[in-house]
């Protein structure tokens, strides 16, 4: 008897050891994948400037991750549990690491980054061609030499980033469903929620680290170590600045590959914990039979795929909920993807500052909201109908808070000839042909080069030449231009490099915007779990696996992939001045019409999300006609539920993993 107890204790210790190591490994994988995804989103502006591509192409690169997910989601959902799950997870981590490395590779293939400028960074001679000189020919034109134009093909290197991001999507697909199903199958049932909660912590810590990395590397110049940064004439707030985006992807690649190593040493199966608590043979056989029935039911799902699909498509609540989710995610995905760009253009912040502010003000409220929401749902045993009303009310409240962003706006940067007249008067927006004025027509300036300077009159000019400056002193970012005829009639009017900063009133509005973001993020996270509860309860038990997978498929196909593309294309239409490549072709946008940008950035998500409340209202109406588990409390009902407990538990074991595998779909796009 004592030997048996010792044997059981030894087996139990081994089980705990293996399960704990697997849990720790899976948590690290969660952290690595969320770290990579959030870092990617934080570096979109840097990638846009590095390759000189429009925002619509950046949106396509973002959507390529969802494309990679779609390529394997069906295979993983229905056949992944038959294979060696830990090894598949390990391979997925390796693929993610290789994808991140591929995304960083263009930096080593393209050579040094050269931003458009007319200024010689080391010269302080007043005879430099970037100054106002009368009666000269324009020699500083975009290069039309065929050899130089061939070199510009390097801008197509963004395709490497596209393919790498697709690989990241492919590699991430098996981690969540197979990892959670492995825990659900071999961990003690009462410990599963704790283990899943630990995994969620990995998903929370990853984005925080990703945003901190993004904020740090956005401040580091892209060619750090290869150029003398003291000679640069741009700063991190300049729209031509490109941070060291590639270093972060190398970090992500290393982290993902390191996290893959433990998974190759785990067995295909572990002994079920319940069996070690009791060595009774009868119970062992009973559990084994139960497991066999679960496997048969799981295989039946694939055989009954078409009937289940037909049943789901004929389920009005399910289809309306999917429509609501698609509309909501269209708005959220677009807003979050281009939030750093909005903060840069609207409030004059650098990419580094914008990413840091997002991490500080958005993520902590989301984490707190998930914890409080989960506690309330469990503590008060909220029914599915009440959950639907709670989700609707909270979402509507968050929507009205979102609309308040229209009150927290700033004016365009004052740039002579683009947003104001040369006298500083706000005027209907100018075109490129209006950048010339009486004060600079004698200078023979280029009108398409973006090399902004800020005059001491508070007005910015597209270049020192267009400001009428005749002299310069200093080098690098400390260069000062003097005798600028467009700035003032006095001989000592001057200008410095860069756009003029926005006033303190704009900084105050940014603070209000961030405070509002705290409440908005918190309320949204409160609504996510009740909403997801509606999804799980509106379908039959045997349809939950396909139902959750199909719901995720709808979101990726109709929101995750197209939303960044069409949203980016609309943002491109608000550009006031495009950068210029060597062959004279347009590059990345240097300045936007912030008023039109704001209408697109805030108006389109407001319209899309506003329309989502219409199908949500129909869901509430339809739910009154149906009865869901927990809605009716009576002794007869409780007795009937007790008798059906064993039957329902079999279905639950089959469907439990798919319930959780897409738990993040409605929560956040971080």
Swiss-Prot record:
Main location: membrane
Compartment(s) of residence: Basolateral cell membrane
Recorded catalytic activity of this chain's protein: estrone 3-sulfate(out) + hydrogencarbonate(in) = estrone 3-sulfate(in) + hydrogencarbonate(out); taurocholate(out) + hydrogencarbonate(in) = taurocholate(in) + hydrogencarbonate(out); L-thyroxine(out) = L-thyroxine(in); prostaglandin E2(out) = prostaglandin E2(in)
Tagged with keyword Metal-binding: no
Tissue-wise expression: Highly expressed in liver, and at lower levels in kidney. Not detected in other tissues.
Biological function: Mediates the Na(+)-independent transport of organic anions such as steroid sulfate conjugates (dehydroepiandrosterone sulfate (DHEAS), 17-beta-glucuronosyl estradiol, estrone-3-sulfate), conjugated (taurocholate) and unconjugated (cholate) bile acids, prostaglandin E2 (PGE2) and L-thyroxine T4. Also capable of transporting sulfobromophthalein (BSP), ouabain and gadoxetate. Hydrogencarbonate/HCO3(-) acts as the probable counteranion that exchanges for organic anions.
Protein name: Solute carrier organic anion transporter family member 1A1
Classification lineage: Eukaryota, Metazoa, Chordata, Craniata, Vertebrata
């Amino acid at each position: 008897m004592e030997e048996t107890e010792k044997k059981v204790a030894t087996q139990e210790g081994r089980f705990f050891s293996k399960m704990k190591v697997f849990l720790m490994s899976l948590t690290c994988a969660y952290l690595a994948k969320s770290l990579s995804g959030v870092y990617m989103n934080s570096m979109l502006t840097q990638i846009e400037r590095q390759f000189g591509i429009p925002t619509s192409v950046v949106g396509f690169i973002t959507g390529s991750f969802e494309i990679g997910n779609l390529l394997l989601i069906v295979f993983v959902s229905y056949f992944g549990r038959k294979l060696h799950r830990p090894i598949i997870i390990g391979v997925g981590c390796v693929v993610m690491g290789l994808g991140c490395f591929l995304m960083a590779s263009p930096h080593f293939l393209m050579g040094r980054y050269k931003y458009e400028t007319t200024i010689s960074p080391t010269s302080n001679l007043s005879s430099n061609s970037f100054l106002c000189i009368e009666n000269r020919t324009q020699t500083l034109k975009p290069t039309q030499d065929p050899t130089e134009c061939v070199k510009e093909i390097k801008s197509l290197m963004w395709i490497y980033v596209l393919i790498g991001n697709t690989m990241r999507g492919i590699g991430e697909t098996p981690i969540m469903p197979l990892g959670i199903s492995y825990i659900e199958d071999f961990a003690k049932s009462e410990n599963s929620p704790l283990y899943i909660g630990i995994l969620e912590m990995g998903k929370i810590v990853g984005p925080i680290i990703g945003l901190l990395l993004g904020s740090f590397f956005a401040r580091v110049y892209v060619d750090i170590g290869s150029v003398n940064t003291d000679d640069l004439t741009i700063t991190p707030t300049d729209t031509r600045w490109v941070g060291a985006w590639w270093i972060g992807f190398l970090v992500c690649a290393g982290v993902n590959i390191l996290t893959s190593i433990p998974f190759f040493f785990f067995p295909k199966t572990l002994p079920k914990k319940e069996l070690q608590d009791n060595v009774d043979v009868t119970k062992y056989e009973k559990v084994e039979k139960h497991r066999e029935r679960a496997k048969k039911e799981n295989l039946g799902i694939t055989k009954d795929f078409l009937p289940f699909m037909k049943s789901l498509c004929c389920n009005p609540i399910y289809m309306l909920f999917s429509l609501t989710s698609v509309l909501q995610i269209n708005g959220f995905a677009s807003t979050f993807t281009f939030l750093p760009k909005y903060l840069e253009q609207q409030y004059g912040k650098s990419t580094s500052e914008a990413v840091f502010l997002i991490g500080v003000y958005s993520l902590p409220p989301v984490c707190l909201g998930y914890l409080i929401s989960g506690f309330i749902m469990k503590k008060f045993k909220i029914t599915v109908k009440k959950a639907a009303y709670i989700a609707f009310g909270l979402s509507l409240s968050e929507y009205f808070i979102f609309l308040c962003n229209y009150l927290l706006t700033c004016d365009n940067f004052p740039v002579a000839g683009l947003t104001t007249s040369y006298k500083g008067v706000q005027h209907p927006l100018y075109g490129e042909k209006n950048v010339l004025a009486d004060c600079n027509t004698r200078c023979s300036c280029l009108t398409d080069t973006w090399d902004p300077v800020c005059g001491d009159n508070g007005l910015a000019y597209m270049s020192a030449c267009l400001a009428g400056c005749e002299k310069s002193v200093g080098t690098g970012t400390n260069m000062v231009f003097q005798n600028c005829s467009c700035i003032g009639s006095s001989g000592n009017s001057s200008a410095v490099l860069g756009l003029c900063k926005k006033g303190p009133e704009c900084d105050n509005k940014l603070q209000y915007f961030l405070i509002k973001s705290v409440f908005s993020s918190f309320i949204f996270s409160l609504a996510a779990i009740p909403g997801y509860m509606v999804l799980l309860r509106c379908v039959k038990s045997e349809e939950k696996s396909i139902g959750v997978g199909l719901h995720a498929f709808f979101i990726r196909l109709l929101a995750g992939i197209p939303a960044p593309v069409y949203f980016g294309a609309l943002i491109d239409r608000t550009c006031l001045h495009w950068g210029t490549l060597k062959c004279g072709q347009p590059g990345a946008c240097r300045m936007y019409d912030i008023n039109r940008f704001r209408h697109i950035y805030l108006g389109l998500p407001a319209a899309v999300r506003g329309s989502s409340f219409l199908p949500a209202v129909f869901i509430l109406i339809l739910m009154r006609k149906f009865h869901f588990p927990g809605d009716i409390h009576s002794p007869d009902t409780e007795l009937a539920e007790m008798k059906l407990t064993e039957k329902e538990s079999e279905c639950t074991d089959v469907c439990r993993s798919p319930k959780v595998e897409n738990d993040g779909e409605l929560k956040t796009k971080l």
